[in-house]
């Protein structure tokens, strides 16, 4: 299984701690090292990392970790890293011809989420999003999290940070297909912003966006200093 890791953004909310954000340390290791190691533990064998802001610094570290881990890792540069994150997924298009994992460089998670997401996902969906139904999860920043409205059959109805009616959170862990890339391109062509969520919305409108409930397992979006402090102090972040 191949994983695409989005690591292109500026990470302005963590800049006072370190830059670029994927190299900010959590428990003695850079964020992106946690993501790569946890994906490896879940059975991922190849990586495509989309870089952008401070790409040279990040790519130097990634070359080191690829050599140390003995894994196949390719970097793809997204010069439009200030644009919505869906364009980083589009940048990886030449290297994803089939189903792939889509991960965020600043999201930490229990590796078993990936294993079960792959094993239990419906084949008729173009995308499956790992969701957290714990609306009181103390690890979640309610002011920043992407919210999801999930139908009874597990399909996504709506997704976005501004939703007022929702029953789950987006964990930033996806099992995707090239259909997501087509959906993002379609969104841009029709005047949309081209975010991942906008691509998911287009798939959802066709009944092609499903979900996987992670239960009570750990995940956190390390997007600011407060989240970094939570990640440093949670036992599962090793």
Residue ranges of model-derived segments:
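Short beta-strand-to-loop acidic/aromatic patch adjacent to the donor-nucleotide binding site
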Residues: 98-108
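N-terminal nucleotide-binding beta1-loop-alpha1 segment
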Residues: 1-17, 208
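Conserved beta-strand segments of alpha/beta enzyme cores
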Residues: 22, 72-74, 155, 208-210
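Conserved alpha/beta core of the MobA/IspD/sugar-nucleotide pyrophosphorylase nucleotidyltransferase superfamily
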Residues: 1-3, 167-238
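Conserved core of the sugar-phosphate nucleotidyltransferase
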Residues: 110-188
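Phosphate- and divalent-cation-binding pockets in alpha/beta enzyme and binding domains
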Residues: 13, 57-60, 85, 112-113, ...
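Conserved N-terminal catalytic core of the sugar/cofactor nucleotidyltransferase
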Residues: 2-5, 29-99
């Amino acid at each position: 299984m191949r994983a695409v890791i989005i690591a292109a953004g500026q990470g302005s909310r963590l800049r006072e701690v370190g830059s670029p954000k994927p190299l900010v340390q959590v428990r003695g290791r850079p964020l992106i090292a946690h993501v790569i190691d946890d994906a490896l533990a879940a059975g991922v064998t190849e990586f495509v990392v989309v870089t952008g802001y401070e790409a040279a610094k990040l790519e130097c570290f990634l070359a080191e970790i690829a050599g140390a881990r003995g894994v196949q890792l390719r970097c793809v540069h997204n010069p439009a890293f200030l644009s919505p994150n869906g364009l980083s997924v589009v940048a990886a298009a030449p290297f994803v011809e089939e189903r792939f994992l889509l991960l965020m460089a600043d999201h930490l998670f229990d590796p078993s989420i990936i294993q079960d997401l792959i094993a239990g996902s419906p084949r008729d969906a173009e995308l499956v999003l790992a969701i957290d139904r714990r609306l009181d999860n103390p690890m979640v920043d309610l002011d920043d999290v992407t919210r999801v409205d999930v139908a009874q059959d597990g399909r996504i109805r709506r997704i976005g940070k501004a939703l007022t009616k929702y029953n789950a959170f987006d964990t930033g862990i996806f099992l995707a297909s090239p259909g997501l890339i087509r959906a993002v391109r379609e969104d841009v062509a029709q005047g949309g912003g081209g975010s991942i969520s906008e691509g998911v919305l287009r798939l959802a409108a066709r009944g092609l966006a499903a979900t996987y409930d992670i239960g009570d397992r750990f995940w956190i979006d390390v997007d600011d200093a407060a989240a970094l402090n939570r990640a440093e102090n949670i036992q599962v972040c090793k």
